[in-house]
UniProtKB/Swiss-Prot annotation:
Major location (coarse): membrane
SUPFAM superfamilies documented for this protein: Immunoglobulin, L domain-like
Ranges per topology, Cytoplasmic: 553-592
Ranges for domain LRRCT: 352-406
Organism superkingdom: Eukaryota
Gene3D superfamilies: Immunoglobulins (2.60.40.10), Ribonuclease Inhibitor (3.80.10.10)
Protein location: Membrane
Signal sequence residues: 1-24
Gene: LINGO3
Segments on the Extracellular side according to the record's topology features: 25-531
Coiled coil: none
Protein name: Leucine-rich repeat and immunoglobulin-like domain-containing nogo receptor-interacting protein 3
Domain named Ig-like C2-type: residues: 407-496
Length: 592
């Protein structure tokens, strides 16, 4: 038996053994010959270990206690392609520390103690494509810090103590495609420093204390396609020209303090396909807010304070595929808000206090085909179906809860009010319908007045129109319009405002009232009637004059056109005069 074991084991002894690494392997590290990788993670190393094979391509030195990198520490590794020095205690890197790594493509220095990158640190790293400097103590980026990194495509400098980025800090980054700046102490962006990044395609700016976006911030970034602005608590407005010059395909402005959709800033972003405005205190989406975003496919407005989405709010969104309005204060979402619902594939309206009535009928009719992304919207009212998911509602309830009733104004008696200037005036307009109608008024000057209107005229809860400090120019007919998804109803009221008695007015008030009357706006009908009356009067006077001239000329009868004149020269004494006397002379004249 022993002999047979010896015979069987003989071929194994004859097999050649795998050659060991040329330079061996450091005692505290693990070497993988096939991938030429050396892993020395969590070994409590205070310096780069000796004995690393010269042909190593990947060196993992993360989570150690290395404090400094000197020029000779990595000089024996010319084949190195990826170096990870993350989560050490590196506070200083000597210029030339990476000079003998011509093949290095990835360098990770995340989570160290670097406060400054001196010039020359990245010399001869011509093939480096990724550099991670995040989670350090960097305070400033000096001019030409990255000037030798001509092939760098991705740069991470977030989670630092940055207070200033010099104007030429990014000079030389000709191929950079992605830049992340986050959790820094920057209070402003320099358009000049970003202007060196001509190939930049994605810019992420997160957790910054910047209060405004200026017009020149991104003007010199024609290739930028993706812009992310997240957690800027001081940002209250996106200026109209802040995105000028960009051709973005993706824009995200989240967790800021903007209170309105930045429609003016979005006006020229015709190539935008994805827009995220989630987690901002936006309460209303007005009509036509996205009318110029003809290529938009995804719109996210989740976790905001949305209470109203006005009709035609999504006008112009012809290619919308995904709409996320989850976790807001919406009671409804009408079909009239869309340019067309036929392109919609995914709808998120979960987390809203939805009123299940006829305004949501279009969703219920499509509940079997619409994708709710696994989060089904549910009814909040009426009480009979509270908590029921829209997708699970039986067809029988459609005729009970999803039927509209046209508004009807209860009191139809015409209101005629006469007031004295300076008094407050109110007109009642109570309407009922299903769902509850909204009430708006139209002034004699054709100006709409709603509950959100500013000025002396406003609509109170219940539909009452209040006009404060009535003036003579407020006189006229007011129209109440009650509307809901089922239709509308109208009602009229008349107001006459008399001037305040002269005895109660000071000269200054009388003068101001006269000026106010002169400034009272004239409608188009008044202007046309006044113009027509003036023209007719002028033409009538001209015609009357012509008739008088004609009658006068005919009444004079026939008269001579020719007449003769006889002229006798005065007699003058003297021989010269006597010689010239020839008697009387005659000549004819013709009157024209």
């Amino acid at each position: 038996m022993t002999c047979w074991l010896c015979v069987l084991s003989l071929p194994l002894l004859l097999l050649p053994a795998a050659p060991p690494p040329a330079g061996g392997c450091p005692a505290r590290c693990e070497c993988t010959v096939q991938t030429r990788a050396v892993a020395c993670t969590r070994r409590r190393l205070t310096a780069v270990p000796d004995g690393i094979p010269a042909e190593t391509r990947l060196l993992e030195l993360s989570r150690n206690r290395i404090r400094c990198l000197n020029p000779g520490d990595l000089a024996a590794l010319p084949a190195l392609e990826e170096l990870d020095l993350s989560e050490n205690a590196i506070a200083h890197v000597e210029p030339g520390a990476f000079a003998n790594l011509p093949r290095l493509r990835v360098l990770r220095l995340r989570g160290n103690q670097l406060k400054l990158i001196p010039p020359g640190v990245f010399t001869r790293l011509d093939n480096l494509t990724l550099l991670d400097l995040s989670e350090n103590k960097l305070v400033i980026l000096l001019d030409y810090t990255f000037q030798d990194l001509h092939s760098l495509r991705r740069l991470e400098v977030g989670d630092n103590d940055l207070v200033f980025v010099s104007r030429r800090a990014f000079a030389g980054l000709l191929a950079l495609e992605e830049l992340t700046l986050e959790r820094c102490n920057l209070t402003a962006l320099s358009g000049e420093s970003l202007g060196h990044l001509r190939s930049l395609g994605a810019l992420r700016l997160r957790h910054l204390a910047i209060a405004s976006l200026e017009d020149q911030n991104f003007r010199r970034l024609p290739g930028l396609l993706h812009l992310e602005i997240d957690n800027w608590p001081l940002l209250e407005e996106v200026a109209a020209g802040s995105l000028r010059g960009l051709n973005l395909t993706s824009l995200s402005v989240t967790h800021t303090n903007i209170t309105a959709v930045p429609a003016a800033a979005l006006r020229h972003q015709a190539h935008l396909t994805c827009l995220n405005l989630s987690h901002n205190p936006i309460s209303t989406v007005p009509r036509g807010s996205f009318r110029d975003l003809v290529r938009l496919r995804e719109l996210h407005l989740a976790g905001a304070l949305l209470a109203v989405v006005e009709p035609q709010a999504f006008l112009g969104l012809r290619q919308i595929r995904l709409l996320n309005l989850s976790n807001n204060l919406l009671s409804t979402l009408e079909e009239s808000t869309f340019h067309s619902v036929n392109t919609l594939e995914t709808l998120r309206v979960d987390g809203n206090p939805l009123a299940c009535d006829c305004r949501l009928l279009w969703i219920v009719q499509r509940r079997k085909t619409l994708n709710f992304d696994g989060r089904l919207p549910a009814c909040a009212t009426p009480a009979e179906v509270r908590g029921d998911a829209l997708r699970n509602l039986p067809d029988s309830v459609l005729f009970e809860y999803f039927v509209c009733r046209k508004p009807k104004i209860r009191e139809r008696r015409l209101q005629r009010v006469t007031a004295t200037a300076g008094e407050d005036v109110r007109f009642l307009c109570r309407a009922e319908g299903e769902p509850a109608p909204t009430v708006a008024w139209v002034t004699p000057q054709h100006r709409p007045v709603t509950a959100t209107s500013a000025g002396r005229a406003r609509v109170l809860p219940g539909g009452t129109l209040e006009i404060q400090d009535a003036r003579p120019q407020d006189s006229g007919t007011y129209t109440c319009v009650a509307s809901n998804a089922g239709g509308n109803d109208t009602y009229f009221a008349t107001l006459t405002v008399r001037p305040e008695p002269a005895a109660n007015r000071t000269p200054g008030e009388a003068h101001n009232e006269t000026l106010a009357a002169l400034r009272a706006p004239l409608d188009l009908t008044t202007i046309l009637v006044s113009t027509a009356m003036g023209c007719i009067t002028f033409l009538g006077v001209v015609l009357f004059c012509f008739v008088l001239l004609f009658v006068w000329s005919r009444g004079r009868g026939q008269h001579k056109n020719n007449f003769s004149v006889e002229y006798s020269f005065r007699k003058v004494d003297g021989p010269a005069a006597a010689a010239g006397q020839g008697g009387a002379r005659k000549f004819n004249m013709k009157m024209i």
